[in-house]
């Protein structure tokens, strides 16, 4: 299990468009992937999520900050940095992935947990202003 967890973490830290073909040996054919934008089942849907990432952002990079294992599940604390197309600023998102492994070491499910509102939407023009206002109104 530890080897599979480490290998999956390395895959993300070195992810590139040409590495997506390696997913066949890393994730199960019916893998489920969930994040704030996607809920897909199957290896092709999983690949499509990352193809879309490479099409829409420049210099995407995942850094695994911490890993914990509980039974067949690993938890990865990570930082994702990228540049929006045509924008010089580097954006950073931090989150946690809950990843369930099968007995053969393949990934069965990958569920991402991160706050899209505060880490992404609030940084966008117009909608960001509205969301920051709402957050201030709801805060204690």
Where are these regions (language model features)?
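Short acidic-aromatic low-complexity motifs
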Residues: 2-26
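Soluble or luminal CAZymes and related metallo-dependent hydrolases
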Residues: 3, 7, 45, 91
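A solvent-exposed, acidic/Ser-Thr-rich amphipathic alpha-helical stretch
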Residues: 20-72
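A beta-strand edge to alpha-helix "cap/lid" segment located at domain peripheries
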Residues: 55-61, 65-140
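Short, mixed-charge, low-aromatic patches
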Residues: 1-10, 33-36, 52-57, 108
């Amino acid at each position: 299990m530890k080897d599979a967890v480490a290998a999956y973490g390395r895959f993300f830290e070195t992810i590139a468009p040409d590495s997506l073909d390696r997913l066949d040996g890393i994730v199960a054919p019916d893998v489920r992937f969930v994040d704030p934008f996607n809920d897909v089942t199957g290896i092709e849907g999983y690949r499509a999520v990352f193809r879309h990432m490479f099409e829409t952002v420049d210099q995407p990079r995942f850094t695994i900050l911490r890993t914990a294992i509980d039974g067949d599940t690993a938890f990865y604390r990570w930082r994702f940095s990228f540049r929006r197309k045509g924008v010089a600023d580097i954006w950073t998102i931090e989150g946690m992935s809950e990843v369930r492994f099968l007995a053969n070491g393949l990934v069965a499910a990958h569920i991402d947990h991160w706050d899209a509102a505060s880490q992404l939407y609030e940084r966008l023009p117009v909608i960001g202003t509205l969301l920051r206002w709402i957050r201030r109104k709801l805060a204690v």
